[in-house]
Amino acid sequence: MHDKILILDFGSQVTQLIARRVREAHVYCEIHPNDVSDDFVREFAPKAVILSGSHASTYEDHQLRAPQAVWDLGVPVLGICYGMQTMAVQLGGKVEWSDHREFGYAEMRAHGHTRLLDGIEDFTTAEGHGMLKVWMSHGDKVAELPPGFALMASTPSCPIAGMADEARGYYAVQFHPEVTHTVKGRQIIERFVLQIAGAKPDWIMKNHIEEAVAKIREQVGDEEVILGLSGGVDSSVAAALIHRAIGDQLTCVFVDHGLLRLNEGKMVLDMFEGRLHAKVVHVDASDQFLGHLAGVTDPEAKRKIIGREFVEVFQAEAKKLSKAKWLAQGTIYPDVVESGGTKTKKATTIKSHHNVGGLPETLGLKLLEPLRDLFKDEVRELGVALGLPPEMVYRHPFPGPGLGVRILGEVKREYAELLRRADAIFIEELRNTTATAQDAAAGLCGEADVGKSWYDLTSQAFAVFLPVKSVGVMGDGRTYDYVTSLRAVQTTDFMTAHWAHLPYALLGRASNRIINEVRGINRVVYDISGKPPATIEWE
């Protein structure tokens, strides 16, 4: 039996990251709404409780509170941002609106040598104070500590940035240790979970395979399942996991919607029919998809259309399978959280994902999502544990709507042809270029990265088609052609990301090849936006 950490979600967009950090410590955790009952909390029997952040205000919203059972259990509790504020209010402290709202990096001083922060620091001041580089995102602040609490951390703008009641194991921080922007955040959460809570680090993907296979068999029984296979990491791992559980009861439906990468269809069929010996049905529905997308420019509308058409294709294929009762998808945690689909339904929607936003209530198939609770790196670990080849497992993620969300505005067959060729050139240059000692010296990568391909050193890379034209010169003639943007990011969880600092020579070669080899594109730009404020995909 795994030790469990209970994460109470107050509606933050990054609550899922808390779960990821806990699981990185190999400890099992679950996310549940903040308004679960006292009986639920007691029956869950957590080793510790973590209270998430929220876009709400403790000063204004008196309904968002943790169940009383959290404070009655006698287990350690960690409050993060809003979680700190509700802890303060519920235990007798005071919270007030701050005149100075903090959003972004801050340098925080630790106080009191608490079990949570003692010895964890990014640098020390001339006076010997331990300092942490943290990520803040709050408007309210704790103005008065609850009885029994001591100051644990502060910033110039937030005098009480952390508080602790060591006797009861209650800790709270105003910053977000779960995001990668907080340099030592992972270490802080790991210390809370392993040392303060004393949870056993026995959550590993091999264990998850056994549990997931058993759950799939229990859900499906002797019924048949169809799965939309895109060739991406998520659908591939989902297919392998389901195939292990139910074998030939699974039929993979590979839909060519006209928005795939270059030569992707052949690769997918060779991989799944040849290597995994899975049943694969190939459906060419490009005319259907592109026809419905004609004239549509709104990103949300495009995603909804693509999701709807996927469902219609699946329903048509399901009718040919007498026992097909289930539609399987490679939905993962980031898909759910960015669609406002956390279990609390309190997160603010950023964009709809076709996996969760395009399914009508009238769907005649039940939904099977075996990866729904996993992050991308967990999915990759699971794929390796299932025996999938590295070239599949470590391939960069590709969105379900395909090139449909990488072509800004209206989707046309002509645009898709230009984009897939430009994208293939960029990916080829990334694969064929290795990091050098000079790159490391320039700070573009670490010394341990020298010799690795830049494809492996980036988490996701692709080209984006911009439906605008610019003037250029080719030979002695004037050109008036389209623009493409190259995008490459580095991230550990895909919830936050930094733009990749690629060598200029690599970018130069990619740009030169695209302009010379892809007739119709005469200008290439590079996207240097992080997430946040931008999302990884442009649409």
From Swiss-Prot:
Metabolic or biological pathway: Purine metabolism; GMP biosynthesis; GMP from XMP (L-Gln route): step 1/1
GO terms for MF: ATP binding; GMP synthase activity
Alphabetically ordered keywords of this record: ATP-binding, Glutamine amidotransferase, GMP biosynthesis, Ligase, Nucleotide-binding, Purine biosynthesis
Catalytic reaction annotation: XMP + L-glutamine + ATP + H2O = GMP + L-glutamate + AMP + diphosphate + 2 H(+)
EC number(s) stated in the UniProt entry for this protein: 6.3.5.2
PROSITE patterns in UniProt: GATASE_TYPE_1, GMPS_ATP_PPASE
SUPFAM superfamilies from the UniProt entry: Adenine nucleotide alpha hydrolases-like, Class I glutamine amidotransferase-like, GMP synthetase C-terminal dimerisation domain
UniProt-listed PANTHER family: GMP SYNTHASE [GLUTAMINE-HYDROLYZING] (PTHR11922:SF2), GMP SYNTHASE-RELATED (PTHR11922)
This protein's name: GMP synthase [glutamine-hydrolyzing]
Species: Burkholderia cenocepacia (strain HI2424)
